[in-house]
Design a protein with these regions (language model features):
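Surface-exposed loop and adjacent secondary-structure segments within mature catalytic domains
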Residues: 145-150, 198-201, 205-262
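Short, well-structured secondary-structure segments
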Residues: 1-170, 187-191, 210-217, 335
C-alpha cells in the first residue's frame, strides 16, 4: 500500500458514492461492517447505519459507510485528533473530501510502519522477528507425515507432500525481504502458528536464524513432562528458560496462560485492573524462583487480533502495564537476542512436531476437506517438477513456483474442515483453487477439471419447505401456483455475487412429478439440449 498498491476494498472505498454500481454496493454491504461489536458500540452512528435496511440507503448513506469503515479502524489516538474527532462527533453527512482525509491518513500510517520499527530496533528498544514467507506450516511442507508424531491415528492425504526445498525457500525469502526492509538479517523467526519440529530445526540454523519460538505444550511433549497441574504452572523451572535444539537454533516457549489472558481475558476488564493482574502473576513467578535464578517469562500472542476487543484498543492496559514494568525493580524487559547474549540455553535433544494450537497440526491437516486440498496441491507441485525436468527453471517455472508456494500458506488449510469457519469459506476455497489453476496455465497445461469442483462442502439451507402439493403450469412464470413451493436461496460470498445466475430455486411435487423453477437474476440464454 505504501508503494501505491491497491485492493478491491480500497478501490471501492475511494470510488465516489454517486458512481457506485450494484456490485460495489453488494461488496460494501458484505465487507464494510467487518468490525467487532466492541468497536461498533463506540460509534452509534455507524451502528445505526448497520441497522438501517439496505434497500433504503441513499447515496449519502453509502458514502457514510465508505467513511465509517475506514474511520472505525483508525487508532483511538488518531481519532482524538482533528479533523477525525469532529467527524466521529458528526457521525453522518460525510463528504468526498472527508473520505479522502481518512483514506490518506491510512496511507500515511502504512508508510510509517517499517521506518518506525526500524528506528526502534536500531535504538535497541525492540527486536523485530519475521516468519517463513507465505506463512506455511513449515513441518507439513517439509513432510506432511510429520503430523503423525502428534496424530498417529490421523487420516492423512492420499499423496504424501514432501517439499523440503520449498520449506527452506520460505525461510530464505523471509530473510531476504527482511534485509530489504531493515538493512540487516533477522536473528529471530516466529514459525507460522508456532509450528516447529526436529526435522525443520536445521533449516533455521543453516539459514542463520538464531532463535525461534513456540508454545509450552510443544515443550511439554518435547521433554516428556507435564508443566501444569490444572491451570497452575507446576514446572516453571522447565518453562521459564530458553533451549538449544539439537542441530537447530535456540527456542523460547510461551507461557500459554499469561499470553491467553492478554489475548482473550483482559479485554473484559478495565485496563488498569488487567495490567495489575498480569504484574501480580509475574511477581508471583519471581518470588517463587530460587535466589539468583534468572527466569525468563515469554509472552506470545496474535498481535493483531486482541486489541479490537478492548474498549479503547488496549490503550489503558498498555499504559498501565508499561508503567508497572518500568518502575518495578524485580522485573526487566529484554529482547530474545539480548537474553541469549548473556544466558546459555538448555540443550533440547528432540523438538516435538507441533504448533501452538494443541501441540499438533490438526487445524491444517487430517479432515476430509483439508486432505483434499493437500492432494490437489501435491498434484500441482508434481506437475511443476515435471515441467522443470522438460524446460528447466525458466521464467514461467519461477512464476508458477512462487504461486504454488503461496498456495502452501497455512491460511488456506485453516479454513478447510469443520474446526474453523470464516463465514466466507467458499471465497477462500475459490481463491486457493484459482492459484493452482494459474500455476497449471503457466506450465502450459489444462488445469484438471477437479479444480472446478469446490472443496468446501456447504450445507444447503432451506429457506422454505413446501407447504402443499402443487401442479404449476410450465409457462416460465413464477405465479401463484408456486407460492406453496419450497425455496432455497442462492448462496455465495461477495466474490460470487457478480457471477450469480439465479436468485433462488423453487421446488415442489404432486402425485406424478417433481417441479423445479429457477428465479434468474437476468434473462438466461436458452440452452441447447
Amino acid at each position: 500500500y505504501g508503494k501505491g498498491a491497491t485492493d478491491r476494498a480500497y478501490i471501492v472505498a475511494q470510488k465516489p458514492a454517486v458512481a457506485l454500481d450494484a456490485s460495489d454496493k453488494d461488496y460494501l454491504a458484505a465487507k464494510f461492517f467487518d468490525v467487532t461489536e466492541v468497536m461498533l458500540k463506540r460509534f452509534p452512528a455507524y451502528a445505526a447505519l448497520k441497522a438501517k435496511p439496505r434497500n433504503t440507503y441513499t447515496t449519502q448513506d453509502w458514502r457514510d459507510l465508505q467513511v465509517w469503515f475506514n474511520l472505525a479502524w483508525l487508532d483511538p489516538d488518531v481519532l482524538a485528533q482533528e479533523p477525525f474527532r469532529e467527524m466521529v462527533k458528526r457521525g453522518r453527512g460525510f463528504s468526498e473530501n472527508d473520505k479522502a482525509r481518512v483514506l490518506n491518513q491510512h496511507l500515511a500510517m502504512l508508510k510509517e510502519i517499517v521506518p518506525l520499527h526500524r528506528r526502534l530496533q536500531e535504538k535497541g528498544l525492540i527486536e523485530v522477528s519475521t516468519t517463513p514467507y507465505f506463512h506455511p506450516i513449515l513441518p507439513l511442507i517439509h513432510d506432511s507425515d510429520s503430523a503423525r508424531e502428534a496424530m498417529p491415528g490421523a487420516s492423512l492425504p492420499l499423496a504424501r507432500f514432501q517439499q523440503p526445498d520449498d520449506a527452506r525457500r520460505h525461510v530464505q525469502m523471509a530473510t531476504e525481504y527482511y534485509k530489504e526492509l531493515f538493512g540487516r538479517a533477522p536473528r529471530g523467526m516466529w514459525p507460522g502458528e508456532g509450528s516447529v519440529g526436529q526435522a525443520v530445526a536445521p533449516i533455521f540454523k543453516e539459514e542463520r536464524i538464531t532463535w525461534i519460538a513456540s508454545d509450552e505444550e510443544v515443550l511439554a511433549n518435547s521433554v516428556g513432562s507435564t508443566l501444569r497441574q490444572g491451570e497452575k504452572l507446576s514446572r516453571p523451572d522447565l518453562l521459564y528458560r530458553p533451549y538449544q535444539v539439537k542441530d537447530g537454533p535456540a527456542i523460547f516457549f510461551r507461557d500459554r496462560r499469561l499470553s491467553d489472558d492478554i489475548g482473550f481475558q483482559y479485554s473484559k476488564m478495565s485496563g488498569k485492573a488487567a495490567a495489575a493482574d498480569l504484574l501480580a502473576k509475574l511477581k508471583q513467578a519471581w518470588t517463587a524462583a530460587p535466589a539468583n535464578d534468572s527466569r525468563l517469562v515469554t509472552l506470545i500472542l496474535d498481535g493483531e487480533n486482541a486489541w479490537e476487543n478492548y474498549p479503547d484498543d488496549g490503550k489503558e492496559f498498555f499504559h498501565a502495564l508499561y508503567k508497572g514494568l518500568t518502575t518495578s525493580s524485580w522485573v526487566k524487559t529484554v529482547t530474545p537476542s539480548a537474553y541469549l547474549a548473556g544466558q546459555k540455553p538448555t540443550p533440547l535433544p528432540h523438538l516435538w512436531a507441533g504448533s501452538w494450537i494443541g501441540a499438533d497440526f490438526s487445524t491444517w491437516i487430517g479432515e476430509g476437506e483439508e486432505n483434499r486440498a493437500w492432494d490437489l496441491l501435491e498434484g500441482a507441485r508434481t506437475a511443476l517438477d515435471r515441467y522443470r525436468m522438460r524446460h528447466g527453471m525458466n521464467a514461467k517455472y519461477e512464476k508458477a513456483h512462487r504461486i504454488l508456494m503461496a498456495a502452501e500458506g497455512s491460511d488456506w488449510f485453516w479454513w478447510y474442515g469443520k474446526d474453523q469457519n470464516s463465514g466466507r469459506d467458499e471465497e477462500f476455497d475459490e481463491a486457493f483453487r484459482g492459484l493452482l489453476k494459474e500455476a497449471y496455465a503457466l506450465m502450459g497445461e489444462t488445469p484438471p477439471q477437479v479444480l472446478d469442483v469446490p472443496i468446501v462442502q456447504v450445507a444447503i439451507a432451506v429457506d422454505q419447505t413446501p407447504k402443499a402439493l402443487l401442479t404449476p403450469p410450465l409457462d416460465g412464470k413464477l405465479g401463484e401456483a408456486w407460492e406453496a413451493a419450497g425455496r432455497i436461496a442462492a448462496t455465495g460470498g461477495a466474490m460470487a455475487q457478480g457471477k450469480r445466475v439465479f436468485e433462488d430455486l423453487r421446488y415442489g411435487w404432486d402425485d406424478t412429478a417433481v417441479y423445479l423453477a429457477f428465479a434468474y437474476t437476468k434473462q438466461p440464454v436458452p440452452m441447447e439440449l
